[in-house]
C-alpha cells in the first residue's frame, strides 16, 4: 500500500523513509473539468507512434554513479547561456534545449546534474496522462540521500508551463532539488504557483515523451520515499513497465 496520497501544491510534505521529500505539481481543479479527488485531468487519446531507434553510437548506460554526486556542494558550475541535452530512453531519444535566462538557478542545477550523469538509469516514475511526466529520483540510494536537502531558491517565473517545457518539481517554496517534470499539455495553471520552466523538449522528441508508460498514474504509482531508499530495484519489481532514461548527456553548450 502506498504510504502517501498526492497532496496539493505548496503543502509541505513529511520526510519519507530516509528523508526523501515528495515533490510534485498537482493540476488545479478547473470548472470545466471534474477530476476524481486530487487526480489530474483525464487522459487524452494519443495517436499511435513508432519508437525512434537509438543511434548505434549512443553511450551505454552506466552501471554505477559518479562519486562527485555524493557532494552536492561541489557541483555549482555556472551553465552556458544556452545548452542542449540528449536523453536516450527506453522509448527513443529526445533533445532538451535549456535557456539559462529563463530560470538561472534551475538551469545551473540541471547543468551540473547532467554533467555528472545524475539521471542515467532513472525512471519516469510519475506519468499522469494529459498532465506531466516526472523524473529525477536517482537510481542509486546513496545519490538520492546526498541530494535530499540540497534545496534551491526559487527562480522567478518568466515562461509559461507549456507543453514540452521542463520545470523543477517542488515540495514547497525554495525546495527544488533534482526532480523535474515535462508538461504533457499547456499547464498555465502552474505558472502562478511558482513553477519556473528552464528548458523545452524538441518537437520531434515529444512524440517519444508521449509514449512513456502512463497507466500507473497517481493512484497506482510508486512511493517516492521508497524509490529514494531502495533505488531502481524497487521500481523494477513493482512497476516494471515504467520507462527509463538510459543516458542524459550534454551535446551542445559544454
Ranges and model annotations:
Residues 17-254:
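Cyclophilin-like peptidyl-prolyl cis-trans isomerases
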Residues 1-18:
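Sec-dependent bacterial lipoprotein signal peptides
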Amino acid at each position: 500500500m502506498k504510504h502517501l496520497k498526492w497532496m496539493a501544491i505548496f503543502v509541505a510534505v513529511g520526510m519519507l523513509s530516509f528523508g526523501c521529500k515528495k515533490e510534485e505539481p498537482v493540476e488545479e481543479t478547473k470548472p470545466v473539468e471534474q477530476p476524481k479527488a486530487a487526480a489530474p485531468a483525464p487522459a487524452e487519446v494519443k495517436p499511435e507512434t513508432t519508437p525512434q531507434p537509438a543511434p548505434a553510437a549512443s553511450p551505454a548506460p552506466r552501471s554505477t554513479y559518479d562519486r562527485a554526486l555524493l557532494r552536492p556542494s561541489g557541483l555549482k558550475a555556472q551553465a552556458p547561456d544556452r545548452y542542449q541535452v540528449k536523453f536516450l530512453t527506453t522509448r527513443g531519444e529526445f533533445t532538451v534545449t535549456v535557456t539559462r535566462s529563463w530560470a538561472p538557478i534551475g538551469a545551473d542545477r540541471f547543468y551540473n546534474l547532467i554533467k555528472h550523469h545524475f539521471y542515467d538509469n532513472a525512471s519516469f516514475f510519475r506519468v499522469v496522462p494529459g498532465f506531466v511526466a516526472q523524473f529525477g529520483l536517482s537510481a542509486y540510494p546513496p545519490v538520492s540521500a546526498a541530494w535530499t536537502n540540497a534545496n534551491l531558491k526559487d527562480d522567478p517565473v518568466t515562461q509559461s508551463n507549456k507543453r514540452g517545457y521542463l520545470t523543477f518539481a517542488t515540495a514547497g517554496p525554495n525546495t527544488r532539488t533534482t526532480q523535474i517534470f515535462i508538461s504533457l499539455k499547456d499547464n498555465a495553471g502552474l505558472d502562478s504557483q511558482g513553477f519556473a520552466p528552464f528548458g523545452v523538449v524538441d518537437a520531434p522528441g515529444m512524440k517519444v515523451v508521449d509514449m512513456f508508460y502512463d497507466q500507473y498514474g497517481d493512484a497506482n504509482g510508486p512511493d517516492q520515499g521508497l524509490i529514494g531508499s531502495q533505488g531502481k530495484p524497487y521500481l523494477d519489481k513493482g512497476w516494471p513497465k515504467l520507462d527509463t532514461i538510459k543516458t542524459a548527456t550534454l551535446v551542445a553548450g559544454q
